[in-house]
Amino acid sequence: PGPCCKDKCECAEGGCKTGCKCTSCRCAPCEKCTSGCKCPSKDECAKTCSKPCSCCXX
């Protein structure tokens, strides 16, 4: 794994932190998902969202 990515990915808005390489970076749980992000609940968003760190609104 690349830098910053051992147990969990360190995220920044829109993707991984600068210099970090990871394939499993996901956004944190949120109130609701933005359109185009498929998830049944806010808790599932971080697990199933395909747009790292930018799928959640609010």
From Swiss-Prot:
Protein residues bound to a divalent metal cation 2: 5, 9, 22, 25
Signal peptide segment: none
Function in brief: Metallothioneins have a high content of cysteine residues that bind various heavy metals. The different forms of lobster metallothioneins may have different biological functions. Class I MTS in marine crustacea are involved in the sequestration of elevated levels of heavy-metal ions. Binds 6 metal ions. Known to bind cadmium.
Gene Ontology MF term list: metal ion binding
Amino acids binding a divalent metal cation 1: 4-5, 16, 20
Keywords: Cadmium, Copper, Metal-binding, Metal-thiolate cluster
Span list, region Alpha: 29-58
Residues that bind a divalent metal cation 4: 30, 33, 49, 53
Family label: Belongs to the metallothionein superfamily. Type 3 family.
Superkingdom of origin: Eukaryota
Protein name per its UniProtKB record: Metallothionein-1
Protein species of origin: Homarus americanus (American lobster)
Binding of a divalent metal cation 6, residues: 39, 45, 49, 56
Binding site for a divalent metal cation 3: 11, 16, 25, 27
Amino acids binding a divalent metal cation 5: 33, 37, 55-56
Keyword Metal-binding: yes
Keyword Signal: no
Region span, Beta: 1-28
